[in-house]
Amino acid sequence: TKASVGFKAGVKDYKLTYYTPDYVTKDTDILAAFRVTPQPGVPPEEAGAAVAAESSTGTWTTVWTDGLTSLDRYKGRCYNIEPVAGEEHQYICYVAYPLDLFEEGSVTNMFTSIVGNVFGFKALRALRLEDLRIPPAYSKTFQGPPHGIQVERDKLNKYGRPLLGCTIKPKLGLSAKNYGRAVYECLRGGLDFTKDDENVNSQPFMRWRDRFLFCAERIYKSQAETGEIKGHYLNATAGTCEEMIKRAVFARELGVPIVMHDYLTGGFTANTSLAHYCRDNGLLLHIHRAMHAVIDRQKNHGIHFRVLAKALRMSGGDHIHAGTVVGKLEGERDITLGFVDLLRDDFIEKDRSRGIYFTQDWVSLPGVLPVASGGIHVWHMPALTEIFGDDSVLQFGGGTLGHPWGNAPGAVANRVALEACVQARNEGRDLAREGNEIIREASKWSPELAAACEVWKAIKFEFPAMDTL
Protein backbone atom coordinates (compact mmCIF):
# COMPACT_ATOMS: atom_id res chain seq x y z
CA THR A 1 0.00 0.00 0.00
CA LYS A 2 1.34 3.42 -0.98
CA ALA A 3 0.86 6.32 1.41
CA SER A 4 -0.42 8.45 -1.48
CA VAL A 5 -3.45 6.21 -1.95
CA GLY A 6 -4.96 7.83 1.11
CA PHE A 7 -5.06 6.43 4.58
CA LYS A 8 -8.21 4.89 6.01
CA ALA A 9 -8.34 5.35 9.76
CA GLY A 10 -10.27 2.97 11.97
CA VAL A 11 -10.18 -0.48 13.47
CA LYS A 12 -10.44 -3.43 11.13
CA ASP A 13 -10.53 -7.15 11.77
CA TYR A 14 -7.11 -8.75 12.06
CA LYS A 15 -8.23 -11.62 9.86
CA LEU A 16 -8.53 -9.36 6.82
CA THR A 17 -4.76 -8.82 6.88
CA TYR A 18 -3.20 -11.60 8.94
CA TYR A 19 -5.26 -14.74 8.18
CA THR A 20 -3.89 -16.14 4.90
CA PRO A 21 -4.91 -19.80 4.44
CA ASP A 22 -3.42 -19.84 0.91
CA TYR A 23 0.07 -18.88 2.07
CA VAL A 24 2.84 -21.32 1.14
CA THR A 25 5.51 -21.30 3.85
CA LYS A 26 9.08 -20.50 2.86
CA ASP A 27 12.16 -22.48 3.91
CA THR A 28 13.44 -19.38 5.70
CA ASP A 29 10.27 -18.69 7.73
CA ILE A 30 10.18 -19.31 11.46
CA LEU A 31 7.01 -21.35 12.01
CA ALA A 32 5.08 -21.43 15.29
CA ALA A 33 2.29 -23.69 16.51
CA PHE A 34 0.09 -21.96 19.10
CA ARG A 35 -2.66 -23.62 21.13
CA VAL A 36 -5.29 -20.87 21.13
CA THR A 37 -8.36 -20.71 23.39
CA PRO A 38 -10.43 -17.74 22.12
CA GLN A 39 -12.90 -15.84 24.31
CA PRO A 40 -16.53 -16.89 23.72
CA GLY A 41 -17.80 -15.35 20.49
CA VAL A 42 -14.36 -14.80 18.95
CA PRO A 43 -13.99 -16.93 15.80
CA PRO A 44 -10.76 -18.97 15.61
CA GLU A 45 -9.68 -17.21 12.38
CA GLU A 46 -9.80 -13.84 14.15
CA ALA A 47 -7.99 -15.23 17.21
CA GLY A 48 -5.25 -16.84 15.10
CA ALA A 49 -4.84 -13.69 13.02
CA ALA A 50 -4.67 -11.59 16.19
CA VAL A 51 -1.81 -13.76 17.46
CA ALA A 52 0.04 -13.39 14.14
CA ALA A 53 -0.52 -9.63 14.12
CA GLU A 54 0.38 -8.86 17.72
CA SER A 55 3.55 -10.98 17.56
CA SER A 56 4.73 -9.29 14.34
CA THR A 57 3.75 -5.98 12.71
CA GLY A 58 0.18 -5.36 13.87
CA THR A 59 -1.40 -3.04 16.38
CA TRP A 60 -5.02 -2.49 17.41
CA THR A 61 -5.87 0.19 14.84
CA THR A 62 -4.75 1.18 11.37
CA VAL A 63 -1.84 3.63 11.44
CA TRP A 64 -0.73 5.89 8.59
CA THR A 65 2.91 4.79 8.96
CA ASP A 66 1.87 1.36 7.62
CA GLY A 67 2.14 3.08 4.26
CA LEU A 68 5.85 3.68 4.74
CA THR A 69 6.78 0.01 4.66
CA SER A 70 5.74 -3.22 2.99
CA LEU A 71 3.48 -5.12 5.37
CA ASP A 72 3.36 -8.01 2.93
CA ARG A 73 7.06 -8.48 3.40
CA TYR A 74 7.18 -8.21 7.19
CA LYS A 75 3.87 -9.41 8.63
CA GLY A 76 3.34 -12.70 10.45
CA ARG A 77 0.68 -14.86 8.82
CA CYS A 78 -1.72 -17.34 10.37
CA TYR A 79 -1.80 -19.93 7.57
CA ASN A 80 -3.57 -22.93 9.11
CA ILE A 81 -5.98 -23.65 11.97
CA GLU A 82 -6.89 -27.09 13.35
CA PRO A 83 -9.31 -27.86 16.18
CA VAL A 84 -7.67 -29.73 19.09
CA ALA A 85 -9.08 -33.25 19.35
CA GLY A 86 -10.96 -33.85 22.59
CA GLU A 87 -10.90 -30.19 23.68
CA GLU A 88 -13.74 -27.77 23.10
CA HIS A 89 -12.89 -24.28 21.85
CA GLN A 90 -9.18 -24.98 21.51
CA TYR A 91 -7.34 -24.65 18.21
CA ILE A 92 -3.81 -25.12 16.97
CA CYS A 93 -3.01 -22.00 14.95
CA TYR A 94 0.06 -22.12 12.74
CA VAL A 95 1.86 -18.82 12.20
CA ALA A 96 4.71 -18.08 9.77
CA TYR A 97 7.14 -15.24 10.51
CA PRO A 98 9.49 -13.78 7.90
CA LEU A 99 13.11 -14.18 8.98
CA ASP A 100 13.80 -10.43 8.71
CA LEU A 101 11.73 -9.81 11.86
CA PHE A 102 14.46 -11.29 14.06
CA GLU A 103 17.94 -10.22 15.12
CA GLU A 104 20.60 -12.78 14.24
CA GLY A 105 21.98 -14.85 17.11
CA SER A 106 19.52 -13.51 19.71
CA VAL A 107 17.14 -15.91 21.44
CA THR A 108 16.12 -12.92 23.55
CA ASN A 109 14.86 -11.03 20.52
CA MET A 110 13.14 -14.10 19.06
CA PHE A 111 11.11 -14.63 22.23
CA THR A 112 10.40 -10.92 22.70
CA SER A 113 8.83 -10.93 19.24
CA ILE A 114 6.99 -14.23 19.28
CA VAL A 115 5.75 -14.42 22.88
CA GLY A 116 6.55 -10.97 24.25
CA ASN A 117 3.22 -9.21 24.00
CA VAL A 118 0.53 -11.46 22.70
CA PHE A 119 -0.07 -13.58 25.81
CA GLY A 120 -1.94 -10.80 27.60
CA PHE A 121 -4.31 -10.30 24.67
CA LYS A 122 -7.94 -9.81 25.73
CA ALA A 123 -9.55 -11.66 22.82
CA LEU A 124 -7.84 -14.84 24.02
CA ARG A 125 -8.74 -16.85 27.08
CA ALA A 126 -5.43 -18.67 27.01
CA LEU A 127 -2.49 -19.17 24.67
CA ARG A 128 0.32 -21.69 24.59
CA LEU A 129 3.31 -21.86 22.27
CA GLU A 130 3.55 -25.59 21.50
CA ASP A 131 6.43 -25.70 19.02
CA LEU A 132 8.72 -23.63 16.80
CA ARG A 133 10.41 -24.56 13.53
CA ILE A 134 13.80 -22.85 13.43
CA PRO A 135 15.06 -22.67 9.83
CA PRO A 136 18.76 -23.39 9.19
CA ALA A 137 19.10 -19.83 7.89
CA TYR A 138 18.40 -18.65 11.45
CA SER A 139 19.99 -21.44 13.52
CA LYS A 140 23.24 -20.88 11.60
CA THR A 141 23.49 -17.42 13.21
CA PHE A 142 23.92 -19.09 16.63
CA GLN A 143 27.03 -20.68 18.12
CA GLY A 144 24.87 -23.22 19.97
CA PRO A 145 26.26 -25.54 22.66
CA PRO A 146 29.86 -24.75 23.66
CA HIS A 147 31.05 -28.27 22.81
CA GLY A 148 28.35 -30.86 22.20
CA ILE A 149 28.09 -34.56 22.92
CA GLN A 150 31.06 -35.98 21.04
CA VAL A 151 33.55 -33.36 22.21
CA GLU A 152 32.39 -33.88 25.80
CA ARG A 153 32.95 -37.65 25.58
CA ASP A 154 36.41 -37.04 24.15
CA LYS A 155 37.28 -34.55 26.92
CA LEU A 156 36.09 -36.95 29.62
CA ASN A 157 37.29 -40.15 27.91
CA LYS A 158 33.99 -41.89 28.72
CA TYR A 159 32.16 -43.87 26.04
CA GLY A 160 29.37 -46.40 25.58
CA ARG A 161 27.29 -45.58 28.63
CA PRO A 162 25.25 -42.79 30.20
CA LEU A 163 27.16 -40.49 32.55
CA LEU A 164 26.35 -40.49 36.27
CA GLY A 165 25.78 -37.42 38.41
CA CYS A 166 24.57 -36.42 41.84
CA THR A 167 23.23 -33.17 43.29
CA ILE A 168 24.83 -32.42 46.64
CA LYS A 169 22.24 -32.24 49.44
CA PRO A 170 21.26 -30.61 51.73
CA LYS A 171 21.29 -28.02 49.02
CA LEU A 172 21.62 -25.07 51.39
CA GLY A 173 23.44 -24.75 54.70
CA LEU A 174 26.66 -26.78 54.32
CA SER A 175 30.00 -25.04 54.80
CA ALA A 176 32.37 -25.04 51.82
CA LYS A 177 34.68 -27.63 53.35
CA ASN A 178 31.87 -30.06 54.23
CA TYR A 179 30.40 -29.49 50.79
CA GLY A 180 33.73 -30.44 49.21
CA ARG A 181 33.84 -33.52 51.39
CA ALA A 182 30.43 -34.67 50.11
CA VAL A 183 31.65 -34.06 46.53
CA TYR A 184 34.77 -36.16 47.11
CA GLU A 185 32.88 -39.12 48.59
CA CYS A 186 30.54 -39.27 45.59
CA LEU A 187 33.28 -38.97 42.97
CA ARG A 188 35.53 -41.47 44.74
CA GLY A 189 32.66 -43.99 44.77
CA GLY A 190 32.32 -43.98 40.98
CA LEU A 191 30.19 -41.04 39.82
CA ASP A 192 31.38 -38.93 36.89
CA PHE A 193 29.94 -35.65 38.14
CA THR A 194 28.53 -33.97 41.19
CA LYS A 195 26.37 -30.87 40.99
CA ASP A 196 25.68 -27.62 42.76
CA ASP A 197 21.99 -27.27 43.42
CA GLU A 198 20.39 -24.60 41.25
CA ASN A 199 19.92 -22.23 44.20
CA VAL A 200 23.50 -22.53 45.45
CA ASN A 201 25.06 -19.26 44.24
CA SER A 202 27.02 -17.30 46.85
CA GLN A 203 25.20 -17.18 50.17
CA PRO A 204 26.41 -16.16 53.66
CA PHE A 205 27.01 -19.78 54.77
CA MET A 206 29.13 -20.60 51.70
CA ARG A 207 30.61 -17.98 49.40
CA TRP A 208 31.23 -19.01 45.82
CA ARG A 209 35.03 -18.70 45.85
CA ASP A 210 35.38 -20.97 48.90
CA ARG A 211 33.12 -23.56 47.32
CA PHE A 212 35.00 -23.48 44.01
CA LEU A 213 38.35 -23.97 45.79
CA PHE A 214 37.26 -26.85 48.02
CA CYS A 215 35.44 -28.60 45.16
CA ALA A 216 38.44 -28.27 42.82
CA GLU A 217 40.73 -29.74 45.47
CA ARG A 218 38.39 -32.70 45.90
CA ILE A 219 38.00 -33.23 42.16
CA TYR A 220 41.78 -33.60 41.79
CA LYS A 221 41.99 -35.93 44.78
CA SER A 222 39.25 -38.23 43.46
CA GLN A 223 40.80 -38.21 39.96
CA ALA A 224 44.14 -39.28 41.38
CA GLU A 225 42.53 -42.13 43.31
CA THR A 226 40.24 -43.48 40.60
CA GLY A 227 42.19 -42.77 37.42
CA GLU A 228 39.01 -41.33 35.86
CA ILE A 229 38.25 -37.75 34.84
CA LYS A 230 35.80 -36.16 37.29
CA GLY A 231 33.81 -32.94 37.37
CA HIS A 232 31.59 -30.85 39.61
CA TYR A 233 29.05 -28.46 38.06
CA LEU A 234 30.17 -25.21 39.64
CA ASN A 235 27.15 -22.90 39.51
CA ALA A 236 28.30 -19.59 38.03
CA THR A 237 24.80 -18.04 38.08
CA ALA A 238 24.99 -14.58 39.67
CA GLY A 239 23.14 -11.30 40.04
CA THR A 240 24.97 -9.65 37.14
CA CYS A 241 26.53 -10.91 33.91
CA GLU A 242 29.90 -9.50 34.94
CA GLU A 243 29.87 -11.44 38.20
CA MET A 244 28.80 -14.61 36.37
CA ILE A 245 31.72 -14.36 33.93
CA LYS A 246 34.08 -13.62 36.84
CA ARG A 247 33.05 -16.93 38.44
CA ALA A 248 33.49 -18.80 35.16
CA VAL A 249 36.98 -17.28 34.77
CA PHE A 250 37.92 -18.49 38.25
CA ALA A 251 36.65 -22.00 37.43
CA ARG A 252 38.80 -22.01 34.30
CA GLU A 253 41.84 -20.89 36.32
CA LEU A 254 41.29 -23.80 38.71
CA GLY A 255 41.39 -26.14 35.71
CA VAL A 256 38.01 -27.79 36.36
CA PRO A 257 36.10 -29.19 33.36
CA ILE A 258 32.58 -27.81 33.78
CA VAL A 259 30.48 -24.91 35.08
CA MET A 260 26.73 -24.51 35.43
CA HIS A 261 24.02 -21.92 34.79
CA ASP A 262 20.31 -21.52 35.58
CA TYR A 263 19.26 -20.37 32.13
CA LEU A 264 15.68 -19.28 32.72
CA THR A 265 16.22 -17.31 35.92
CA GLY A 266 19.56 -16.03 34.59
CA GLY A 267 18.04 -15.11 31.23
CA PHE A 268 18.95 -15.93 27.64
CA THR A 269 21.28 -12.96 27.18
CA ALA A 270 23.40 -14.02 30.16
CA ASN A 271 23.26 -17.66 29.07
CA THR A 272 24.47 -16.94 25.55
CA SER A 273 27.34 -14.81 26.89
CA LEU A 274 28.38 -17.64 29.20
CA ALA A 275 28.13 -20.23 26.40
CA HIS A 276 30.46 -18.12 24.23
CA TYR A 277 32.93 -17.82 27.10
CA CYS A 278 32.78 -21.58 27.69
CA ARG A 279 33.55 -22.43 24.07
CA ASP A 280 36.40 -19.95 23.93
CA ASN A 281 37.92 -21.38 27.10
CA GLY A 282 37.25 -25.10 26.89
CA LEU A 283 34.67 -25.31 29.70
CA LEU A 284 31.66 -27.59 29.47
CA LEU A 285 28.35 -25.93 30.42
CA HIS A 286 25.65 -27.66 32.46
CA ILE A 287 22.22 -26.01 32.27
CA HIS A 288 19.53 -26.21 34.94
CA ARG A 289 15.96 -25.30 34.00
CA ALA A 290 14.85 -23.75 37.32
CA MET A 291 11.53 -21.88 36.79
CA HIS A 292 10.53 -23.91 33.72
CA ALA A 293 7.32 -25.25 35.29
CA VAL A 294 6.07 -21.70 35.87
CA ILE A 295 6.15 -21.33 32.09
CA ASP A 296 5.40 -24.82 30.78
CA ARG A 297 3.21 -26.72 33.24
CA GLN A 298 -0.25 -25.40 32.33
CA LYS A 299 -1.63 -27.36 29.44
CA ASN A 300 -3.45 -24.49 27.76
CA HIS A 301 -1.26 -21.49 28.58
CA GLY A 302 2.45 -20.69 28.51
CA ILE A 303 5.28 -22.22 26.47
CA HIS A 304 5.88 -25.95 26.11
CA PHE A 305 9.26 -27.16 27.35
CA ARG A 306 10.20 -28.43 23.88
CA VAL A 307 10.36 -24.78 22.79
CA LEU A 308 12.51 -23.84 25.79
CA ALA A 309 14.75 -26.82 24.96
CA LYS A 310 15.17 -25.70 21.33
CA ALA A 311 15.95 -22.19 22.55
CA LEU A 312 18.61 -23.57 24.88
CA ARG A 313 20.26 -25.51 22.06
CA MET A 314 20.50 -22.23 20.14
CA SER A 315 21.63 -20.15 23.12
CA GLY A 316 24.12 -22.80 24.24
CA GLY A 317 24.52 -25.52 26.86
CA ASP A 318 26.10 -29.00 26.90
CA HIS A 319 23.68 -30.59 29.40
CA ILE A 320 20.08 -29.69 30.23
CA HIS A 321 17.61 -31.17 32.68
CA ALA A 322 14.82 -32.86 30.77
CA GLY A 323 12.59 -34.73 33.24
CA THR A 324 12.88 -38.42 34.10
CA VAL A 325 9.69 -40.14 32.93
CA VAL A 326 10.01 -42.31 36.08
CA GLY A 327 10.94 -40.09 39.06
CA LYS A 328 9.26 -37.38 41.12
CA LEU A 329 9.08 -34.63 38.49
CA GLU A 330 6.80 -34.13 35.51
CA GLY A 331 7.47 -35.95 32.25
CA GLU A 332 5.28 -38.09 30.00
CA ARG A 333 7.27 -40.67 28.08
CA ASP A 334 6.59 -40.01 24.38
CA ILE A 335 6.54 -36.24 24.79
CA THR A 336 9.73 -36.27 26.88
CA LEU A 337 11.50 -38.45 24.32
CA GLY A 338 10.31 -36.06 21.61
CA PHE A 339 12.19 -33.12 23.07
CA VAL A 340 15.12 -35.33 24.14
CA ASP A 341 15.57 -36.12 20.43
CA LEU A 342 15.24 -32.41 19.59
CA LEU A 343 18.16 -31.79 21.94
CA ARG A 344 20.44 -34.59 20.72
CA ASP A 345 19.76 -35.29 17.05
CA ASP A 346 20.62 -33.35 13.88
CA PHE A 347 17.32 -34.00 12.13
CA ILE A 348 13.93 -34.70 13.72
CA GLU A 349 10.90 -35.68 11.65
CA LYS A 350 7.49 -34.14 12.38
CA ASP A 351 5.59 -36.55 14.65
CA ARG A 352 2.43 -35.31 16.33
CA SER A 353 2.20 -38.42 18.54
CA ARG A 354 5.36 -37.17 20.28
CA GLY A 355 4.29 -33.53 20.26
CA ILE A 356 6.64 -32.58 17.43
CA TYR A 357 4.67 -30.23 15.19
CA PHE A 358 7.40 -29.48 12.65
CA THR A 359 10.32 -31.24 11.02
CA GLN A 360 13.42 -29.66 12.55
CA ASP A 361 16.77 -29.65 10.76
CA TRP A 362 19.59 -28.45 13.03
CA VAL A 363 22.19 -28.96 10.27
CA SER A 364 25.49 -29.04 12.20
CA LEU A 365 24.53 -27.39 15.50
CA PRO A 366 26.11 -29.50 18.29
CA GLY A 367 23.77 -31.61 20.43
CA VAL A 368 22.90 -31.31 24.11
CA LEU A 369 22.97 -34.19 26.63
CA PRO A 370 19.60 -34.58 28.38
CA VAL A 371 19.85 -34.91 32.16
CA ALA A 372 17.39 -37.16 34.00
CA SER A 373 17.15 -35.96 37.58
CA GLY A 374 14.58 -35.94 40.36
CA GLY A 375 13.40 -38.74 42.63
CA ILE A 376 15.25 -41.57 40.90
CA HIS A 377 17.12 -44.48 42.52
CA VAL A 378 18.79 -47.81 41.64
CA TRP A 379 15.53 -49.63 40.83
CA HIS A 380 14.91 -47.05 38.08
CA MET A 381 18.27 -47.72 36.41
CA PRO A 382 17.07 -50.29 33.82
CA ALA A 383 14.18 -48.05 32.73
CA LEU A 384 16.43 -44.96 32.55
CA THR A 385 19.09 -46.82 30.56
CA GLU A 386 16.46 -48.03 28.12
CA ILE A 387 14.54 -44.76 27.80
CA PHE A 388 17.46 -42.32 27.56
CA GLY A 389 20.17 -44.50 25.98
CA ASP A 390 23.89 -43.79 26.16
CA ASP A 391 23.83 -40.07 25.39
CA SER A 392 22.43 -38.84 28.68
CA VAL A 393 23.35 -37.92 32.23
CA LEU A 394 21.52 -39.79 35.01
CA GLN A 395 21.50 -37.79 38.22
CA PHE A 396 20.76 -39.32 41.59
CA GLY A 397 20.76 -36.81 44.46
CA GLY A 398 18.86 -38.49 47.28
CA GLY A 399 19.43 -41.75 45.39
CA THR A 400 23.16 -41.43 46.17
CA LEU A 401 23.31 -39.44 49.41
CA GLY A 402 20.40 -41.32 50.98
CA HIS A 403 22.31 -44.61 50.99
CA PRO A 404 22.34 -46.04 54.54
CA TRP A 405 26.15 -46.38 54.51
CA GLY A 406 26.94 -42.90 53.15
CA ASN A 407 27.81 -41.12 49.91
CA ALA A 408 30.63 -43.28 48.55
CA PRO A 409 28.70 -46.57 48.92
CA GLY A 410 25.69 -44.78 47.40
CA ALA A 411 27.83 -43.84 44.41
CA VAL A 412 29.16 -47.41 44.17
CA ALA A 413 25.60 -48.77 44.14
CA ASN A 414 24.61 -46.47 41.27
CA ARG A 415 27.73 -47.22 39.23
CA VAL A 416 27.34 -50.99 39.68
CA ALA A 417 23.65 -50.80 38.73
CA LEU A 418 24.47 -48.75 35.63
CA GLU A 419 27.31 -51.01 34.47
CA ALA A 420 25.07 -54.06 35.00
CA CYS A 421 22.26 -52.52 32.92
CA VAL A 422 24.61 -51.48 30.11
CA GLN A 423 26.21 -54.93 30.03
CA ALA A 424 22.80 -56.64 30.02
CA ARG A 425 21.61 -54.40 27.20
CA ASN A 426 24.76 -55.10 25.18
CA GLU A 427 24.16 -58.82 25.66
CA GLY A 428 20.73 -58.36 24.09
CA ARG A 429 18.60 -58.66 27.22
CA ASP A 430 15.29 -56.78 27.51
CA LEU A 431 15.73 -54.10 30.17
CA ALA A 432 12.03 -53.30 30.36
CA ARG A 433 11.09 -56.91 31.15
CA GLU A 434 14.13 -58.16 33.03
CA GLY A 435 15.21 -54.93 34.74
CA ASN A 436 14.47 -55.96 38.33
CA GLU A 437 16.15 -59.32 37.78
CA ILE A 438 19.29 -57.63 36.38
CA ILE A 439 19.55 -55.36 39.44
CA ARG A 440 18.98 -58.31 41.81
CA GLU A 441 21.73 -60.36 40.14
CA ALA A 442 24.18 -57.47 40.34
CA SER A 443 23.38 -56.86 44.01
CA LYS A 444 24.56 -60.41 44.85
CA TRP A 445 28.17 -59.35 44.37
CA SER A 446 27.81 -55.72 45.45
CA PRO A 447 26.82 -55.27 49.10
CA GLU A 448 26.47 -51.51 48.46
CA LEU A 449 23.88 -52.14 45.75
CA ALA A 450 22.09 -54.73 47.89
CA ALA A 451 21.72 -52.17 50.70
CA ALA A 452 20.39 -49.54 48.26
CA CYS A 453 17.89 -52.02 46.81
CA GLU A 454 16.59 -52.75 50.29
CA VAL A 455 16.09 -49.09 51.24
CA TRP A 456 14.18 -48.04 48.11
CA LYS A 457 12.33 -51.22 47.23
CA ALA A 458 8.87 -49.70 47.73
CA ILE A 459 9.35 -46.06 46.69
CA LYS A 460 7.16 -44.81 43.86
CA PHE A 461 6.07 -41.33 42.77
CA GLU A 462 2.98 -42.31 40.81
CA PHE A 463 0.70 -39.47 39.75
CA PRO A 464 -1.03 -39.03 36.40
CA ALA A 465 1.03 -36.95 33.95
CA MET A 466 -0.17 -33.39 33.36
CA ASP A 467 1.57 -33.09 30.01
CA THR A 468 -0.69 -34.99 27.63
CA LEU A 469 -1.12 -34.34 23.93
Swiss-Prot record:
Gene3D superfamilies (UniProt xref): Ribulose bisphosphate carboxylase, large subunit, C-terminal domain, RuBisCO large subunit, N-terminal domain
An example Gene Ontology molecular-function term: magnesium ion binding
Main enzyme class: lyase
Binding residue positions for substrate: N117, T167, K171, R289, H321, S373
PTM annotation (N6,N6,N6-trimethyllysine): residues: K8
Site (Transition state stabilizer): K328
Keywords: Calvin cycle, Carbon dioxide fixation, Chloroplast, Disulfide bond, Lyase, Magnesium, Metal-binding, Methylation, Monooxygenase, Oxidoreductase, Photorespiration, Photosynthesis, Plastid
Residues where N6-carboxylysine is found: K195
Statement: the UniProt record of this protein carries the keyword Oxidoreductase: yes
Cofactor note (record): Binds 1 Mg(2+) ion per subunit.
GO BP annotation list: photorespiration; reductive pentose-phosphate cycle
InterPro entries, alphabetized: RuBisCO, RuBisCo_large_chain_AS, RuBisCO_lsu_C, RuBisCO_lsu_C_sf, RuBisCO_lsu_fd_N, RuBisCO_lsu_N_sf, RuBisCO_lsuI
Nucleotide-binding in keyword set: no
Post-translational modification: The disulfide bond which can form in the large chain dimeric partners within the hexadecamer appears to be associated with oxidative stress and protein turnover.
Residues at the active site: K169 (proton acceptor), H288 (proton acceptor)
This enzyme's EC code(s): 4.1.1.39
Known cofactor(s): Mg(2+)
Binding residue positions for Mg(2+): K195, D197, E198
Cellular component, GO, one term: chloroplast
Domain of life of the source: Eukaryota
Further details from the record: The basic functional RuBisCO is composed of a large chain homodimer in a 'head-to-tail' conformation. In form I RuBisCO this homodimer is arranged in a barrel-like tetramer with the small subunits forming a tetrameric 'cap' on each end of the 'barrel'.
Annotated function: RuBisCO catalyzes two reactions: the carboxylation of D-ribulose 1,5-bisphosphate, the primary event in carbon dioxide fixation, as well as the oxidative fragmentation of the pentose substrate in the photorespiration process. Both reactions occur simultaneously and in competition at the same active site.
PANTHER family linked to this entry: RIBULOSE BISPHOSPHATE CARBOXYLASE, RIBULOSE BISPHOSPHATE CARBOXYLASE LARGE CHAIN
Record protein name field: Ribulose bisphosphate carboxylase large chain
Organism: Coleonema pulchellum
Chain's gene name: rbcL
